[in-house]
Amino acid sequence: MKAIYALLLICMVITSCNKDKEGRIPEVPVNFRAPLNDPRISGLNSAGGAVVIKGYGVAGLIIYRRPDLAYVAFDRCSSVNPEQSCAVTLDDPNLTATDPCSGAKFSLYDGTPVKAPAKRPLKQYQVIVTNFEISVIN
């Protein structure tokens, strides 16, 4: 009888771990670097600015300069059905990003979902800013 309980417990642990990994944005290496005077990031010159950088991450990057002047970066891959790699688009004004496939919306301040069906935030990357360069890495 103990063996049956142990087997059931192992099955429950295995299936619960698999469910946690479902719907996760894949891990890919990200190493974006640009000089601060690069025209691709000129939208970050003032607070509230955001830019889209293609060719990095799963579906590209969004870099946002928050009102407190901190920089944050997110993968554009929506956390709703990430296996589709649906790239979120910037809304106007640049306070949210929308998943065109599901209609979900995400805050650019911290990547959290602000409109269903999203339940998980956008994947966030580390941003490093020096006197001359901005880097987005993981």
Per-region residue spans from a language model:
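C-terminal motif of bacterial Sec signal peptides marking the signal peptidase cleavage site
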Residues: 13-16
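Short cysteine-rich clusters marking metal-coordination/redox-active sites
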Residues: 78, 98-99
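N-terminal pre-ligand scaffold of iron-sulfur
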Residues: 19-93, 107-108, 121-138
